Amino acid sequence: MGEQLNGLKRTHMCGELTVEDVDKYVVVMGWVQRRRDHGGLVFIDLRDRTGIVQVVFSNEVSSEAFEKVQSVRSEYVLAIEGKVVKRSPENVNPKISTGEIEIYANTLKILSKSETPPFPIEDRSNVSEAVRLKYRYLDLRRPSMQKNLMTRFKITKVVRDFLNKNGFIEIETPLLIKSTPEGARDYLVPSRIYPGKFYALPQSPQIFKQLLMISGFDKYYQIAKCLRDEDLRADRQPEFTQIDIEMSFVEVEDVLKINEKMIAEIFKETLGIDVPIPFKRLSYQESMERFGTDKPDLRFGMELKDLSDIVAQSEFNVFKTALKNNGSVRGINVKGAASMPRRQLDELVEFAKTYGAKGLLWIQVFEKEVKSPATKFLSEEEMKKILERLEAEAGDLLLIVADKDEIVFDTLAHLRLELGKRFNLIDENKYEFVWIVDFPLLEYDEGEKRYVAKHHPFTAPKDEDIELLEKEPLKVRAKAYDIVLNGTEIGGGSIRIHDTELQKRMFKVLGFSEEKAWERFGFLMEAFKYGAPPHGGIAYGLDRLAMIITGSDTIRDVIAFPKTQNAVCLMTDAPSEVSEEQLKELHIKVDL
């Protein structure tokens, strides 16, 4: 059994001691990073979340502490009292913040012993993610993981401080709510008291934050847990955290402006970076046409160019078929890549096919000639205009896709990113923000044979497009906006519908009968009857934002206890079976 503190109080954190503390008697507590025995002296590197300090045990200073330290091993938890001493110049360790000093120990308490951990507690440790997640409490001791979670904490602190001083109120919304499935599946919670009835866990606080605006709270925020029973996808978590914000009496520009200031403050406080505001703005249409995606990475060029008008009369069958089927022909210019070997070109063709393209046309531009499988199918004039449109020079490689717009955009967007990485065109130290605005309000779902909301059913249409809602739904633009950073969407929001009649029209276009709409959202429709202010807001994915700011490879590295890609907690073995007794109480039978 470990020793008790018996009134011993920690005076300093390990990583915070400096030469200013020389000759002070201090008490430090933490874990043993490593132990080195040099005969008459034993050195312990003691670690806590602030860093490491070297502690020296000498028989001459304290024979009791020296004798006790002989049994100490890695990851033992110790309390040490001793005197801070300046190291001699040749013993200074510039790799650690406390490298100019060490502690000569007078007292040692072994608070807790440790078995040999399954992997070394250090950043260089080469261990599988599965083992790290199984022993997450050990993984979290590693300095990089401690730093990640401290940065995450700093982000939420900056958010709270900023919003508090700007008149926002932090309000919690319920976790047990009514199931209103639209989009991802709800996690359901059976009610024991009302057999056969279920609560849902919230996919977002969306409806409640709108109700708070109707309640008169004006400016709301919350660091909210959200849960979605989604199909398994890489780097998605069944539970995630949102920075959730809503404001009354605002238009799009008001929401964008205050959020730009908040983001700038987050980056200033966490990374020491001055982010220029206002951010760039791109309409959804422009973003798709220039980058093939509504999540553009603006750190490099290689923009898409539409070649459809140039090849409109072409006899080349590939182009002809695409244009006949209301598709398009678009291309990108990979500067200086004309000499790419045939094997790599073939790999790019296969890469394009994974995104639904039937093929990929390449054109190599050299000083005196142009090489391409399509040379014999294109007229001299067509080739000349293609080279001009793509601003081709000797040494460039042109890549062209002809198909339906969605396939052309998706393929070229992924090719652009892939080649940007291959040719080191992306500056990893750059942060390029952009607002994507004027999204389509609706999309048509071929599977369900109905219109679905691009964002959610409460998004307001642009005023000038309202009359198109029933006549030409796909032409209606939304008062919606996404914030994209380096090709990753970190947040999104909209101005909401605050009028009962317009909300009814929206539900009708989405294929909801009046009864179905009332059954799911009647409480919101009822609230609209009693004076709803114009309102709008935004939600950020905190996990994704923290991942970008910390430079992590996966969101699992910025969440304390994440699930795997298979939505499993390897540490606690959740989800797990429950007893027959528990199921009986809930009136549930498992039918597998």
Swiss-Prot record:
Physiological role: Aspartyl-tRNA synthetase with relaxed tRNA specificity since it is able to aspartylate not only its cognate tRNA(Asp) but also tRNA(Asn). Reaction proceeds in two steps: L-aspartate is first activated by ATP to form Asp-AMP and then transferred to the acceptor end of tRNA(Asp/Asn).
EC class (word): ligase
Lineage, opening ranks: Bacteria, Bacillati, Bacillota, Clostridia, Thermoanaerobacterales
The family this protein is said to belong to: Belongs to the class-II aminoacyl-tRNA synthetase family. Type 1 subfamily.
GO biological process: aspartyl-tRNA aminoacylation
Quaternary structure annotation from Swiss-Prot or TrEMBL: Homodimer.
Protein residues bound to L-aspartate: 182, 228, 455, 496
Cellular component GO terms, alphabetical: cytoplasm
Keywords per UniProt: Aminoacyl-tRNA synthetase, ATP-binding, Cytoplasm, Ligase, Nucleotide-binding, Protein biosynthesis
Protein name per the record: Aspartate--tRNA(Asp/Asn) ligase
Catalyses which reaction(s): tRNA(Asx) + L-aspartate + ATP = L-aspartyl-tRNA(Asx) + AMP + diphosphate
Region Aspartate, residue ranges: 206-209
Origin species: Thermoanaerobacter sp. (strain X514)
Molecular function as annotated in GO: aspartate-tRNA ligase activity; aspartate-tRNA(Asn) ligase activity; ATP binding; catalytic activity, acting on a protein; nucleic acid binding; transferase activity
Compartment(s) of residence: Cytoplasm
Keyword ATP-binding assigned: yes
PANTHER family hit by this protein: ASPARTATE--TRNA LIGASE, MITOCHONDRIAL, ASPARTYL/LYSYL-TRNA SYNTHETASE
